[in-house]
């Protein structure tokens, strides 16, 4: 066998008859499988041991030779080779077909490859292959056209007319094979190339397609006649097994049935030919053989599929590869693995961040081999078998051994669906009682896990390397930041937030206010003995906390704080300022000076002058974590997070917050607000009855009135709320619930959507405290049901989107340090109308500059060229008033099959510059796909008469962008740069005309009457600018402008959708995806190159082809960029393995085989499929080919002690 990690590429071609014979170990002549009495395979049948190898290891069929010592001997009695039984998984047989048979993939596929090669229509081919018509092969001296069809009757008439033997016409696949043999590739290609110079329209399209196929045959060395089979390979029997069930019946693979039909028909045909049977009978048998082979290769492709028992279609060879259950996706890309388990998860609040609790029974099963090895090593058992018995008996001594074995051995925990890379993380196992896995509460957010019955899978990394990678790269404590936006993903939630919120509250006039303590311990003691409350504002000597970064003025003073905040600051990293106010200034700069007083000053007066600070909310805790990470990186941050978690749980327990019905306040003037709304609605309806407004206007006015009433109640609720109310505390802290939940409990439920998505005019006036009437309850069920169905549909859509995104970008890896491009991307803030969707500062952080950034007024250089922009630099640039910056971007990167470090910038998951080998394509796809479930499903009605177009939003809009579809509500764009000189309305055609005049010419654009205009007369417009509201069609923009404009537009559009839903995604992720959509060009004029016109090819391949021609002084080819949707881009990838495992498996493989395509295994997917280590991360060539350390041996002379010198030599070598 070839070592899987050694070969560099894999090629697929058509198999020639001689190749099939060379694979085969013998001909299968009989349709028999297994003898039903002896259960032994029949001779010359589909399971024959002579052909395929023995069924038992090292044993021939008759039993003459047994044991391994006869290895390789062929038994003289039964003819079976003595070898391993697993050769039955690799040895093939063959069937010699008595008549040629066409291969259905090449005849039926779209476009029909046989048809294109012969220049015949697929219908004509079908008539010939299935014996409905004759085809003229050689007209000789008759006036017949070659390749013309003759019916049975016409054939006989022509024979009589011209005499027997005056021309050659045949039917069946044999005829097609003869025609294919006669194809002169070089001559045909020359003719087509001539034709292309003058042809236009449909004729040109066809010529390009034919040329493509013929050229593929010529370049690959495949012969066209191999598309017709004379010999059929039989796949190894263990890949189409037959097993005995309990009841003595057999379960067999469908392929055996399909092969049996082929063999039966082939044998019958052989007999008929021997007997010289009448032509019509032989013809019929040949047709049936053709149909049998078609069904074997791709059942159901032509006509009705062949069915088995219960009219179930049989699974043919093609079906074995296709779809989610096919070979690619079921067995090659997603295998089940050993050393794994799954169980329900429960919360483990006492665990450290890098730990997880594993039940004892589970651990002993998972680590069994390790425990057994240790048992034998300690001489507790004589051999492995005894050790295994010991473990299975549950001997007391195994538990201590297990404890030692799992120490320092990380395990992986995974929760399905794994939407992003944080869905699998490594933990150190801790043995626990019970049967549930224990999970640290802070990692729940990354997994999107909760403890209402979720299950998780556990995996054990076995090799030293796997353990090292799990520990260094995947440990949960390392994953503080979310790869999609670089923000902390492990923010505390629920109880932890509530506890810290309660702890940091301040209260005026609580017991012990104004007491001054000498240090932390004294303050805590006073609190524990009831002299002061957690919320009491007290003084504490600054000198008692020498480790905090105080300013010189603040030292030796007394600081006003609360006991709660003293405890809260206890857990903070030492170098952070003492936190009193929940704001950034306090966190990043220093504790505000107003809280300090001189010893002897009146503390009560100072306290009275200070306003009460709001407590620390979830958002503030997130900022503290981000700042801690920025300063101290992972180790300190994860330790701090554990302290924060413990403190939060402890104090939310002590606070003992409860919720009762009395905690939901009653709004005093609710009745008045609702009455006023009723009157207003009555007035609106009156006006409508008088004909003062349209139905649409009335509907909008009524719904607006009720919406305003609900908002008025909400506003009243917020004004009158008591900050100590437990529900308010939960809502305000960000622990649970939001204002809309609160207003449904205490205000009114408001308007509901009907099943058709239109909002009903009758609102629900009650709230949950008062309780709903039966009718109101019924109304509210519509919304609930719609919510459930939407979520279910959205999950599926979002998952499929992620799959397509991953597929198109999986081969984008950081390949080099710097590509040395001379282009950059000029960026500004992204705006949507007047609103800023994404600020310039956000877009700058973590990118490299292309040119240096200068201060717009003073001209001083703020950031040098090719420099990584940090948060502080970005703030400085924006503060200086800079509005646009040229940065290095993925769009302009020149690296082949990937990106370089400088064009990418920082890795958002670590906050450091990205490493070579990082699989940024997959990360980008996950970052865009994972929040997909949070996007809405519906297209919004903008309401009113203002616009007749629905603006697509949410998930459908993202799909529209990435699939490069024509958008709904398309905007009209101008092709001319210049000034809008006139806008005329034409009431007869209900359109408007916009006239744009520029230096290069003028344009006249027809716009629908109802469209909202974006421009006015006198406006300056650029090429490709939208004249009306709506989305621009990207393909149209590409025709008018350049690639970069389209890329920038798509980037902005994606960001608008996500940001409007409150989801932040780093620009670079979208850039990676959009670049993949624009990586191909279509050849327009081949010039002196040997490219074919109309071919789609990678930009890098195109420039290579031109480079050589330009150097030798020829005419280079011209091309134009093509924008492809992600599905199409995935199928057009250079790797046929990746494309075939994505969609349209048979089409991709047919095409690849004709072209004799080579897969250079550059992406991740193709390497996973063949079982090679992926070429990203630690699997990259530059990290793998490291020589072992060479040790110089020093000769030691007896009697004199010598220190041996060890020199380390480590030289990385690269394959390329």
Curated annotation (Swiss-Prot):
Annotated protein name in UniProt: DNA-directed RNA polymerase subunit beta'
Cofactor: Mg(2+); Zn(2+)
Enzymatic class: transferase
Catalytic reactions on record: RNA(n) + a ribonucleoside 5'-triphosphate = RNA(n+1) + diphosphate
HAMAP family named among the record's database cross-references: RNApol_bact_RpoC (MF_01322)
GO biological process terms, semicolon-separated: DNA-templated transcription
Classification via CDD domains: RNAP_beta'_C, RNAP_beta'_N
UniProt gene name: rpoC
């Amino acid at each position: 066998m070839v070592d899987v990690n050694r070969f560099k590429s894999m090629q697929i071609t058509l198999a020639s008859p001689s190749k099939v014979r060379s694979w085969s170990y013998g001909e299968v002549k009989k349709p028999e499988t297994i003898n039903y009495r002896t259960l032994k395979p029949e001779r010359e049948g589909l399971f024959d041991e002579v052909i395929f190898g023995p069924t038992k290891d090292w044993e021939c069929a008759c039993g003459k030779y047994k044991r391994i010592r006869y290895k390789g001997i062929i038994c003289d009695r039964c003819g079976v080779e003595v070898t391993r039984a697993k050769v039955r998984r690799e040895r093939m047989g063959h069937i010699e077909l008595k008549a040629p048979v066409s291969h259905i993939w090449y005849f039926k596929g779209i476009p029909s490859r046989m048809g294109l090669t012969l220049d015949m229509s697929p219908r004509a081919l079908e008539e010939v292959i299935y014996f409905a018509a004759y085809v003229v092969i050689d007209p000789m001296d008759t006036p017949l056209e070659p390749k013309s069809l003759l019916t049975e009757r016409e054939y006989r008439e022509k024979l009589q007319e011209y005499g027997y033997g005056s021309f050659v016409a045949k039917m069946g696949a044999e005829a097609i094979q003869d025609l294919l043999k006669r194809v002169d590739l070089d001559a045909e290609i020359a003719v087509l190339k001539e034709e292309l110079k003058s042809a236009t329209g449909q004729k040109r399209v066809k010529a390009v397609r034919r040329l493509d196929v013929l050229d593929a045959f010529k370049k690959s060395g495949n012969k066209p006649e191999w598309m017709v089979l004379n010999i059929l390979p039989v796949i190894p029997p263990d890949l189409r097994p037959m097993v005995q069930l309990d009841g003595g019946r057999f379960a067999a693979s469908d392929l055996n049935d399909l092969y049996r039909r082929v063999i039966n028909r082939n044998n019958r045909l052989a007999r008929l030919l021997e007997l010289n049977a009448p032509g019509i009978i032989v013809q019929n048998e040949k047709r049936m053989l053709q149909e049998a082979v078609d069904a074997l290769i791709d059942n159901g492709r032509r006509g009705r599929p062949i069915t088995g028992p219960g009219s179930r279609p049989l699974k043919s060879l093609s079906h074995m590869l296709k779809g989610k259950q096919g070979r690619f996706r079921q067995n090659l890309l997603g295998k089940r693995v050993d050393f794994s388990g799954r169980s329900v998860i429960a919360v483990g609040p006492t665990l450290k961040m890098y730990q997880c609790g594993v039940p004892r029974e589970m651990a002993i099963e998972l680590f069994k081999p390790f425990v057994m090895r240790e048992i034998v090593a300690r001489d507790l058992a004589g051999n492995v078998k005894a050790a295994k018995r010991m473990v299975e008996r549950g001997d007391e001594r195994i538990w201590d051994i297990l404890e030692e074995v799992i120490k320092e051995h990380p395990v992986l925990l995974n929760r399905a669906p794994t939407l992003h890379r944080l869905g699998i993380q490594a933990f150190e196992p801790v043995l626990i009682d019970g049967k549930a896995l224990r999970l640290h509460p802070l990692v729940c957010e990354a997994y999107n896990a909760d403890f209402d019955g979720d299950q998780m899978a556990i995996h054990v990394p076995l090799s030293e390397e796997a353990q090292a990678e799990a520990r260094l790269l995947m440990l949960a404590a390392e994953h503080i930041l979310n790869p999609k936006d670089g923000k902390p993903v492990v923010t505390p939630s629920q109880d932890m937030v509530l506890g810290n919120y309660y702890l940091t509250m301040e209260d005026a006039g609580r017991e012990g206010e104004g007491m001054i303590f000498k240090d932390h311990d004294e303050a805590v003691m006073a609190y524990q003995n009831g002299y002061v409350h957690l919320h009491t504002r007290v003084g504490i000597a600054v000198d008692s906390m020498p480790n905090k970064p105080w300013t010189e003025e603040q030292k030796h003073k007394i600081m006003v704080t609360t006991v709660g905040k003293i405890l809260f600051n206890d857990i903070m990293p030492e170098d952070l300022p003492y936190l009193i106010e929940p704001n950034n200034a306090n966190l990043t700069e220093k504790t505000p000076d107003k809280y300090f007083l001189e010893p002897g000053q009146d503390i009560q007066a100072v306290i009275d002058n200070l306003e009460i600070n709001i407590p620390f909310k979830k958002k503030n805790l997130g900022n503290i974590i981000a700042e801690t990470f920025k300063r101290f990186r992972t180790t300190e941050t994860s330790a701090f997070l554990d302290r924060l978690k413990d403190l939060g749980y402890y104090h939310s327990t002590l606070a003992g917050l409860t919720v009762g019905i009395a905690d939901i306040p009653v709004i005093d003037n609710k009745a008045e607000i609702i009455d006023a709304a009723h009157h207003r609605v009555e007035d609106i309806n009156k006006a409508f009855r008088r004909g003062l407004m349209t139905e649409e206007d009335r509907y909008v006015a009524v719904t607006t009135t009720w919406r305003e009433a609900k908002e008025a109640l909400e506003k009243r609720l917020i004004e009158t709320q008591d900050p100590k109310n437990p529900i308010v505390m939960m809502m305000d802290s960000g622990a649970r619930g939001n204002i809309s939940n609160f207003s449904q409990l205490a205000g009114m439920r408001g308007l509901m959507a009907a099943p058709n998505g239109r909002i009903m005019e009758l609102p629900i006036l009650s709230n949950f405290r008062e309780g709903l009437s039966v009718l109101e309850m019924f109304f509210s069920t519509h919304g609930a049901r719609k919510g459930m169905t939407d979520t279910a549909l959205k999950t599926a859509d979002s998952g499929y989107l992620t799959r397509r995104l991953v597929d198109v970008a999986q081969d984008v890896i950081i390949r080099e340090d710097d590509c040395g491009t001379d282009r950059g991307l000029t960026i500004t803030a992204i705006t949507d109308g007047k609103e800023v969707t994404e600020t310039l500062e956000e877009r700058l952080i973590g990118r490299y500059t292309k040119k240096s950034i200068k201060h717009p007024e003073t001209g001083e250089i703020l950031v040098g060229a090719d420099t990584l922009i940090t948060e502080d630099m970005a703030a400085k640039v924006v503060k200086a008033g800079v509005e646009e910056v040229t940065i290095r971007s993925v769009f302009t990167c020149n690296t082949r099959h990937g990106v370089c470090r400088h064009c990418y910038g920082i890795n958002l998951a670590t906050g450091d510059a990205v490493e070579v080998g990082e699989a940024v394509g997959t990360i980008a796809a996950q970052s865009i796909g994972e929040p997909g479930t949070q996007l809405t499903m519906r297209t919004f009605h903008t309401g009113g008469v203002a616009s007749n177009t629905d603006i697509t939003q949410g998930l459908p809009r993202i799909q529209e962008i990435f699939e490069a579809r024509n958008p709904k509500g398309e905007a009209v764009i101008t092709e001319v740069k210049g000034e809008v000189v006139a806008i005329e309305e034409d009431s007869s055609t209900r359109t408007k005309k916009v006239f744009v005049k520029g230096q290069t010419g003028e344009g006249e654009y027809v716009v629908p009457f109802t469209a909202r205009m974006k421009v006015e007369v006198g406006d300056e417009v650029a090429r490709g600018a939208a004249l009306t509201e709506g989305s621009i069609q990207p393909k149209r923009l590409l025709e008018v402008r350049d690639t970069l404009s389209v890329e920038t537009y798509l980037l902005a559009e994606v960001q608008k959708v996500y940001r409007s839903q409150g989801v932040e995604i780093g620009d670079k992720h979208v850039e990676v995806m959009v670049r993949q959509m624009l990586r191909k060009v279509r050849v327009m004029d081949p010039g002196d190159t040997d490219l074919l016109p109309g071919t789609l090819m990678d930009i890098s391949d195109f420039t290579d082809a031109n480079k050589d021609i330009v150097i030798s002084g020829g005419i280079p080819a011209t091309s134009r960029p093509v924008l492809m949707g992600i599905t199409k881009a995935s199928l057009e990838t250079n790797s046929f393995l990746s494309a075939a495992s994505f969609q349209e498996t048979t089409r991709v493989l047919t095409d690849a085989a004709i072209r004799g395509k080579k897969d250079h295994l550059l992406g991740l997917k193709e390497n996973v499929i063949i079982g090679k280590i992926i070429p990203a991360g630690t699997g990259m060539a530059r990290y793998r080919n490291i020589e072992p350390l060479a040790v110089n041996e020093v000769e030691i002379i007896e009697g004199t002690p010598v220190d041996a010198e060890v020199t380390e030599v480590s030289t990385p070598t690269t394959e390329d």
